[in-house]
Amino acid sequence: MTATPRMARYLEYSTQIYNIYLKYIAPEDIHVYSIDEVFLDVTQYLKTYGMTARELASRIATEILEKKGLTATAGIGTNLYLCKIAMDIVAKHMEPDDNGVRIAELDEISYRELLWDHRPLTDFWRVGGGYRKKLEAAGLYTMGDIARCSLGGEQDFYNEDFLYKM
């Protein structure tokens, strides 16, 4: 099956969804990553709305569904990396709620618990096939392996310098 690309329509939807974000978040707290992905820094809005990050994400996703007929996936984290990983690896692989929405949360502890042994490394943001091959050639197959490698001292084979030189 093939589909004709309709970029103008895609851009129109993207703009309309961005306008939904603006109902909740100021433009300086919306960081566009791509045409269909943004980072929202909602930290200062949670108290104002009296909501958790999950509740606010759910409200925004529900409005996107109601106004545009599109389901949304959200990743919530204590930093941008964890937000992205929560969305890319955890949320996209979980069962949706009744509205088709998927929301996953990660902090440093849950990242270790859920993803320390996750494979393949290419599922992680910014780890491409070439870098994966270099890491695996060095015996590093998981994020846990990489984290342990960074703990090595100057005299150890595995240490931070080893990673930087890859």
For each feature predicted by the language model, list its residue ranges.
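Gly/Gly-Pro- and Ser/Thr-rich, intrinsically disordered tail segments characteristic of DNA damage-repair
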Residues: 1-166
